[in-house]
UniProtKB/Swiss-Prot annotation:
Species in which this protein is naturally found: Treponema pallidum (strain Nichols)
Name the UniProt record assigns to this protein: Replication restart protein PriA
Alphabetized GO MF terms: 3'-5' DNA helicase activity; ATP binding; ATP hydrolysis activity; DNA binding; zinc ion binding
UniProt function note: Initiates the restart of stalled replication forks, which reloads the replicative helicase on sites other than the origin of replication. Recognizes and binds to abandoned replication forks and remodels them to uncover a helicase loading site. Promotes assembly of the primosome at these replication forks.
Domain Helicase ATP-binding positions: 143-309
Motif DEAH box: positions: 252-255
Family: Belongs to the helicase family. PriA subfamily.
Alphabetical list of InterPro entries matching this protein: DEAD/DEAH_box_helicase_dom, Helicase_ATP-bd, Helicase_C-like, P-loop_NTPase, PriA, PriA_3primeBD, PriA_3primeBD_sf, PriA_C
Keyword Signal among record annotations: no
Gene3D superfamilies referenced in this protein's UniProt entry, alphabetically: P-loop containing nucleotide triphosphate hydrolases (3.40.50.300), PriA, 3(prime) DNA-binding domain (3.40.1440.60)
Location of the Helicase C-terminal domain: 390-570
Binding site for Zn(2+) 2: 375, 378, 393, 396
NCBIfam families found in the cross-reference section: priA (TIGR00595)
This protein's UniProt keywords: ATP-binding, DNA replication, DNA-binding, Helicase, Hydrolase, Isomerase, Metal-binding, Nucleotide-binding, Primosome, Zinc
Length: 657
């Protein structure tokens, strides 16, 4: 008789389902393969997690009530027991169903497609490797001499050679016959790292990232399974790569928030990497010039070993950093910054201007009645994008034509408030019409021009590069002298406990692009809050003082890393339903919370409406993770959301907006 199969599906049901295998596959091992199966009125892809020759009737079930699968999708197993164990851990830790976790782990498409992983790197040749500094050598020796699942942090100033440490450690691991996972925040923004990996490892390396189609990703997955690759580089999801004999996991730019998934399961690649390294009994190496506060605290406690790199490998002094108070400046670009852009060009060098807001203007405002044009589906102002001639919502993507008068009072006395990268681009072009200027932001990323623009800038074909936070990530430019941060205040006052941490990291990362190969590098930070600790510490490159102040404040206010948080968001198309569900949940949670733990909320999310859904949130807070996790699990088991209300759970949220 054909075996009985235990399946899980990508649905929010924390249970498995028993199906009959079709006769065509009788006798085949189906565990680890995907199948097409009827699920209620739908047909879904299921994951086979076990099989049995024992009839369900032996356990009291009626055989005739069990459905038969429609067909088997995979010729060979797509996942093994290692992946299944990881998915079980994720389901438990991140409060989701096993099928949802497994769906995040394995590729989703049915057919394979061949991909040349490093096609964009063709023709790149390896440059002569430079002599390692003493600090680099110590870091490499510490990593390669490690036995067991030890965590390290390569903490170095920008340009200190962290990538070389990672690559040399990877070479040593490969020489022992083991494999390596190399995580980066965003593949499209780390082309130089890709080139380094290509010239070091060639066909041994594979790329896994979100820009691959489902079929391309499946093809790469299969080749990794067949051991055609022993190095995998990629963004967040590359942590699940099916490598055999895993010997090292590297996480570059550990502080980057893109390592946290915004969708179920809302996993953080750092936590999954720690799990995989513990399972494989191998070292985990993180690195950044600006560690997350959690990572810094782990280093202070000795849970993670810090490996410092204090000097730039190209030599020379770090750039000089000036803070300009623009509270009395009439224009966005201060006189000081404009003068330095001109001097930099005259000296034959390049400039980079940073503003963490895309678009032309931030909002449409009426001077007569104070009306601000907002998205009808989201509780956020629409942003004016001059190039496409539309007001756009950066949450749901909705666009509409700009109004000629105030929609509320019909006044013509209106204005566009705030500025974005498009505005700066126009302003710089007006000031320097003869300069070659380019812009890099999310809009440019979608058009696929980022890599081309960055290569042109690196080749000296662009005089001034404008951009959002993506220009802060992993680029080296030989003749970049000046970096201007147009408005350091953009993220400082966001109602999120990580606001100062993010702003400090951005300022440090952007500043780190300046003067890597130029002796007189300069960074100009424009702000209306020159005394803010994040600005002061960024000006002096003083990480230790910033983290000390931030940790003291977090401890006083009972925020991570001194407590653990779990966030619940209740969303509904009806405001009243979302609110009622949140208050009902609050009553249930309050009754369950043990001594020392508390419930924050309910309250409307900072962004109270997204894509037409109203949002309320509750935060669970406790010094011990098992405590808060148990309360959250009990709550999810007991709470029954009303029709039309959806509950989202987020363990260790990176933002609370």
């Amino acid at each position: 008789m054909a075996p009985w199969l235990e399946l899980v599906f990508d649905v929010p049901l924390d249970k498995s389902f028993t199906y009959r295998a079709c006769a065509a596959h009788a006798g085949e091992a189906l565990v680890g393969r995907r199948v097409l199966a009827p699920f209620g009125a739908r047909t879904l892809i299921g994951f086979v997690i076990s099989e049995s020759h024992s009839s369900p009737a032996d356990c009291g079930g009626a055989v005739g009530t069990f459905k038969e699968i429609i067909r088997v999708i995979d010729r060979e197993a797509l996942f093994d027991q290692t992946h299944l164990a990881c998915a079980r851990w994720m389901a438990h830790f991140y409060l989701c169903a096993l099928g949802q976790a497994l769906c995040a782990v394995v590729p989703s498409r049915k057919r394979e497609r061949t991909l040349s992983s490093f096609a964009s790197c063709a023709g790149v040749r390896r440059t002569d490797t430079y002599a390692l500094s003493g600090e680099q050598r110590k870091a490499i020796d510490a990593i390669t001499a490690s036995t067991g699942a030890r965590s390290f942090y390569v903490h170095g100033v920008t340009g200190s050679g962290k990538t070389e440490v990672f690559l040399r450690a990877a070479e040593a691991v490969l020489a022992r016959g083991k494999s390596v996972i190399y995580l980066v925040p965003e593949i499209a923004l780390t082309h130089q790292v890709l080139q380094e990996v290509y010239v070091r490892f060639g066909s041994q390396a594979a790329v896994l990232h979100s820009a691959l189609s489902g079929s391309q990703r499946l093809g790469e997955w299969r080749r990794i399974q067949c051991m055609r690759h022993c190095v995998v580089i990629g963004a967040r999801s590359a942590i699940f790569a099916p490598l055999k004999r895993l010997g090292l996991v590297i996480m570059d730019e550990e502080h980057d928030s893109s390592y946290k998934s915004a969708h179920v399961p809302r996993y953080h690649a750092r936590q999954v990497a720690m799990y995989r390294c513990a399972d494989a009994n191998c070292p985990f190496v993180m690195g950044s010039a600006t560690p997350s506060v959690e990572a810094w605290y782990a280093m202070l406690r000795g849970a993670v070993r810090r490996l410092p790199l204090t000097a730039r490998v190209a030599g020379g002094a770090p750039p000089r950093v000036e803070v300009v108070d623009v509270s009395k400046e009439a224009l966005l670009l201060s006189t000081r910054l404009v003068d330095e852009i001109r001097k930099t060009k005259e000296a034959g060098y390049q400039s980079m201007l940073f503003l963490n807001r895309r678009g032309f203007s931030y909002s449409f405002q009426c001077r007569s009645c104070g009306y601000t044009l907002c998205c009808t589906q989201c509780a956020v102002p629409l942003t004016w994008h001059k190039r496409v001639g539309a007001m756009q919502c950066h949450y749901c993507g909705r666009q509409e034509a700009p109004p000629e008068s105030c929609p509320c009072c019909h006044s013509f006395d209106t204005r566009y408030g705030g500025v974005g990268t498009e505005y700066i681009e126009e302003a710089v072009q007006a000031l320097f019409p003869e300069y070659r200027i380019a812009r890099v932001d999310t809009d440019a990323l979608r058009s696929g021009h980022v890599q081309q623009t960055m290569e042109q800038f690196r080749a000296g074909k662009i005089d001034v590069l404008l951009g959002t936070q993506m220009i802060a990530k992993g680029f080296n430019f030989p003749t970049l002298r000046l970096v201007g941060i147009a408005c350091a205040d953009t993220g400082l006052h966001t109602p999120d406990f990580r606001a100062a941490e993010r702003s400090f990291a951005l300022m440090m990362q952007v500043a780190g692009r300046a003067g890597r190969y130029v002796d007189n590098g300069l960074v100009i930070i424009q702000t209306r809050n020159p005394a803010h600790p994040a600005v002061v510490c960024a000006q002096h490159g003083d990480c230790e003082s910033f983290y000390a102040q931030e940790l003291a404040q977090r401890e006083a206010l009972c925020f991570p890393p001194f407590v653990r948080l779990i966030r619940f968001v209740f969303r509904s198309k009806t405001r009243r339903k979302a609110k009622d569900a949140a208050y009902a949940a609050h009553a249930l949670l309050t009754a369950q919370m043990p001594l020392g733990a508390d419930v924050l909320g309910p309250a409307a999310c900072v962004v109270a409406q997204v894509a037409g859904s109203y949002r309320m949130q509750i935060l669970l807070r406790a010094p011990s993770f098992p405590v808060v996790q148990q309360v959250a699990r009990s709550f999810l088991d007991e709470f029954r959301a009303p029709a039309g209300v959806y509950v989202e759970s987020d363990v260790d949220p990176v933002n609370v907006l």
